[in-house]
């Protein structure tokens, strides 16, 4: 198990180094002070994921732990999408289709995806699916109303107020059965 975590953290840092080097190439014309500031911000974000993971069992104030969790997990997703976008532009360059603004386009696409995902996370919605099951019941009962919820992320990801909102949304459906997944 420790080997798995070492490999996972190594991949995470390799991805961040790849993003950092690509960003350094894209920002070559910027003043030194701007580069230093962006480097400090970048590595603070990159290390926040590791920090939030290591601080899980400590007695941090809830606000600090929640903030570290939000930044750390957000940075993990940022790293994933940014690396994928940068690889696409590097493949273009490999096949002699260089894109001068590949880093900036990757950054824009990644931040757009993160913003879209965060908005949807903060504004949960309900969807209705009617599923017909061709099975006779013992009693000729009314249709069963099932509510399925997933990706709630209890803990530092979802606080008590957000959980209360989810419970109200679920109860408003008046379900016969609640399924909780993920």
Name these PLM-found stretches:
Residues 1-124:
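Non-catalytic terminal accessory segments
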Residues 11-18, 27, 31, 152-163, ...:
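Contiguous hydrophobic segments
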Residues 119-181:
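Membrane-interface segments at or immediately adjacent to transmembrane helices
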């Amino acid at each position: 198990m420790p080997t798995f975590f070492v490999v996972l953290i190594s991949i995470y840092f390799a991805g961040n180094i790849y993003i950092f080097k690509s960003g350094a190439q894209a920002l070559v014309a910027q003043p030194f002070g701007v580069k230093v500031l962006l480097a400090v911000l970048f590595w603070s974000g990159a290390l926040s994921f590791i920090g939030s993971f290591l601080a899980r069992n400590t007695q941090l104030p809830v606000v600090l732990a929640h903030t570290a969790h939000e930044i750390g997990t957000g940075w993990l997703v940022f790293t994933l999408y940014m690396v994928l976008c940068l690889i696409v532009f590097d493949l273009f360059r490999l096949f002699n289709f260089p894109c001068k603004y590949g880093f900036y386009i990757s950054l824009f696409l990644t931040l757009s995806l993160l913003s879209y995902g965060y908005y949807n996370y903060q504004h949960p919605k309900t969807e209705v699916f009617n599923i017909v099951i061709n099975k006779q019941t013992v009693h000729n009962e009314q249709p069963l109303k099932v509510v399925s919820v997933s990706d709630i992320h209890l803990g530092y990801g979802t606080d008590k107020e957000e959980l209360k909102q989810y419970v109200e949304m679920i109860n408003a459906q008046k379900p016969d059965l609640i399924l909780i997944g993920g």
